[in-house]
Amino acid sequence: MNGLQLIATGGALPGRTITNDALSRMVDTSDAWITSRTGIRTRHWCTEDESAATLAIAAARQALDRSGLAPADIACCVCATLSAPDATPSVACQVQAALGLPENRPALDINAACSGFLYGMAVARGMLTTLGGQYALVIGCEALSRLMDPTDRSTCVLFGDGAGAAIFRLADTPFALTLGARGSDVLHAGGPSREGSAPITMDGKAVFRFAVDALPKCLHTVLDETRLTLEDLSWVVCHQANSRIIDHCIKALQADPAKFYKNMDRHGNTSAASIPVALNELAESGQLTPGKPLACIGFGGGLTWGGAIFQYKE
């Protein structure tokens, strides 16, 4: 069994909702300016007692409850984040403790920026095949509001906080995964021990050019590997960075826009959390078709990128 099959999801969003109008009172911007350039209307920011770790724990607990599995069934926990509240312990170890996962199983954080969830899938799959076990918990969580300069309109309008979790199992079902990285000075964020002292900065134009090239290529790669077509997929879930990026991808692929899920209008760019948050929304609303494959494609700082095709549980 070489593939991963999605069996359960969970999600968590902070209690504080920030509208474009609220941001227009903080920086020189407007709802029309933000919406026309990004497609974002609202985003969620952590309250004082929330963090990437608390959100991850809530999302993971929901996924575990929905899976019908016991904590002892989880063979590994991988958490993708660039905004962990502590240098150590990792968010994954905090999740392990909170959910009562076995102590003799690996738990670790990784940072591949907005591609992190896809990288996390690869790490989890490798652990299952190398160390044994059937089920993996993969989380993407962020508290990017803690890493932003609230006076920088080029970033504060984009980013939101949130967490998504997914439980995968090894399965002989359609599966493909591709990852890549290209060293580049596109996104910088201060380390967790210096939270807030080195805020996120981004070369938006460079990221846009990179993304509209990388996303279609990633999707073609995993489609070719599985010998599937776009028509075979139930959904294509892109990293939710910017509506215009996804629209360019749709045009390049000559694809049906209805097949591409979007939620950045409500959540903004939640980096590593964006893909699993979207998966959870699709699962909660009954829009994931059991037994049918779907694709996830993402890109992020580094530069990094990735794509995956996998099946939702039968």
What are these regions (language model features)?
Residues M1-E48, P150-R209, D213, K217-H220, ...:
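Condensing-enzyme catalytic core mediating Claisen C-C bond formation in acyl metabolism
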Residues L6-A8, I34, A63, C77, ...:
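Buried hydrophobic positions in well-ordered alpha/beta secondary-structure cores of metabolic enzymes
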Residues V27-S36, D86-G100, L137-L144, A189-R194, ...:
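Acidic-glycine-rich active-site phosphate/pyrophosphate-binding loop
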Residues I40-T42, D73-V78, A97-N111, S145-T151, ...:
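Glycine/charged-rich beta-loop-alpha catalytic/anionic-binding loops adjacent to active sites
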Residues A53, I57-A60, L64, S83-A84, ...:
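Claisen-condensing/thiolase-fold acyl-transfer catalytic domains that form or cleave C-C bonds
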Residues A59-A75, K217-S234, L282-Q287:
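Phosphate/pyrophosphate-binding loops at sites that engage ATP/ADP/AMP, CoA/4′-phosphopantetheine
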Residues A80, N111, A136-E142, F168, ...:
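Short beta-strand segments
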Residues M127-G160:
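Flexible, glycine-rich active-site loops centered on histidine and acidic residues
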